[in-house]
UniProtKB/Swiss-Prot annotation:
Expressed by the mandibular venom gland. Has a hypotensive activity. The keyword Chloroplast does not apply. Transmembrane segments: none annotated. It comes from Caribicus warreni. The lineage of its organism: Eukaryota, Metazoa, Chordata, Craniata, Vertebrata. This is Celestoxin.
Length: 185
């Protein structure tokens, strides 16, 4: 209990910038990732504390770009961020911005043959090329249910479209949803 109280006190007192101790506590307490990360699926969710968000900025749950919470002290775009930079659509892996549907191992994915989304040759999962695979949830390739433009409005959780949410308010995390099987492998 003393440790939890100390963590909450530090989160309230630290500055709002993404390098603050409070922002790092979000990764420490909930994990830093797209599925199961702090403020995302199965993580801490948003914890309003006197106008502050544990490990991030104030709980501005009505922001247009705020769908499933914050990670690392910055507002998320759709499904949060990994590596300290804002995500493009479904977050990033390896500390670089994603190329439309996220990255694996720090390199941009190539999907369907071109320069961005629908612009590449293949998606690489754990070193294995998987053509015509949309995104990866929990290490598993999942089908792309809607277009990326619609996903910016809807958001995608575990490969399933979900209504746009005003963040994860009141400290309630978003439950995990079933992950569909990959297609066109």
């Amino acid at each position: 209990m003393k440790f939890i109280a100390a963590v909450l006190l530090v989160a309230l007192l630290c500055p709002k910038d993404s390098t603050s101790l409070a922002s790092r506590l979000s990764g420490l307490l909930g994990g830093d990732g797209i599925l199961g990360g702090s403020g995302l699926l199965g993580g801490l969710g948003k914890i309003p504390l006197g106008g502050r968000l544990l490990g991030g900025r104030p709980d501005d749950v009505l922001r247009e770009d705020d769908v499933l919470g914050e990670v690392g002290g910055r507002p998320d775009d759709v499904l949060g961020e990994v590596g300290g930079r804002p995500d493009d659509v479904l977050g990033e892996v390896g500390g670089r911005p994603d190329d439309g549907l996220g990255e694996l191992g720090g390199g941009p994915n190539r999907l369907f043959g071109g320069s961005r989304l629908f612009g590449g040759v293949e998606k690489v999962v754990a070193g294995i090329p998987l053509p015509n695979v949309a995104d990866v949830a929990g290490g598993l390739p999942v089908a792309l249910p809607v277009s990326v433009r619609r996903r910016r409005a809807l958001g995608v959780v575990g490969g399933l479209p979900v209504p746009k949410l005003p963040g994860v308010a009141g400290g309630l995390p978003v439950p995990k949803l079933p992950v569909p099987l990959p297609v066109n492998l």
